[in-house]
C-alpha cells in the first residue's frame, strides 16, 4: 500500500481546483495555480485548446507574473489589496488573482472574444471560491 505525502495530496487538491475553475466558462483556455516564484503548482488547459506558449515561455511568463504580483503587494498599505490584474493581448486575455496566501497566484487565459464583463464576472466567482476553499 502506497501512502500519499501531504505534498501529493496538496497537488491533487490544486489539480481539482483548476478543473473546477476551468468548468466555470467555455471561454477559459487555461487555469493555473503558481507559487510566489512562478513555479506551476497545478494547471489545466481546456480540451482541444492548443497552447500559445512553448514550455520555456510559459515558465518565464509565470515567473514574471509572480514577480509582478510580489511587487504589487508592497503597495497594499498605500492603495489597498490586489483584487485582480487583467492583461489584454492580441490573442488572449490574461487574468491573475492572488491566492488566499501570499504564496500562490491564480492564472487564467481567456479566448480573445471574451468581454471584460464576462472576465469580471468570472473573477468575482473565483474570489468567492478561493475564500471558500480556505
Each model region followed by its residue ranges:
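Non-catalytic interaction/Regulatory regions outside core domains
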Residues: 1-134
Amino acid at each position: 500500500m502506497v501512502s500519499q505525502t501531504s505534498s501529493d495530496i496538496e497537488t491533487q487538491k490544486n489539480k481539482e481546483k483548476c478543473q473546477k475553475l476551468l468548468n466555470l466558462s467555455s471561454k477559459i483556455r487555461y487555469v493555473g495555480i503558481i507559487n510566489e516564484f512562478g513555479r506551476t503548482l497545478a494547471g489545466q488547459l481546456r480540451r482541444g485548446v492548443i497552447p500559445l506558449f512553448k514550455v520555456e515561455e510559459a515558465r518565464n511568463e509565470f515567473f514574471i507574473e509572480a514577480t509582478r504580483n510580489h511587487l504589487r503587494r508592497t503597495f497594499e498599505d498605500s492603495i489597498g489589496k490586489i483584487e485582480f490584474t487583467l492583461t489584454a493581448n492580441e490573442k488572449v486575455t490574461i487574468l491573475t488573482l492572488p491566492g488566499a496566501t501570499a504564496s500562490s497566484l491564480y492564472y487564467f487565459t481567456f479566448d480573445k472574444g471574451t468581454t471584460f464583463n464576462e472576465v469580471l464576472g468570472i473573477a468575482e466567482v473565483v474570489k468567492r471560491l478561493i475564500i471558500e476553499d480556505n
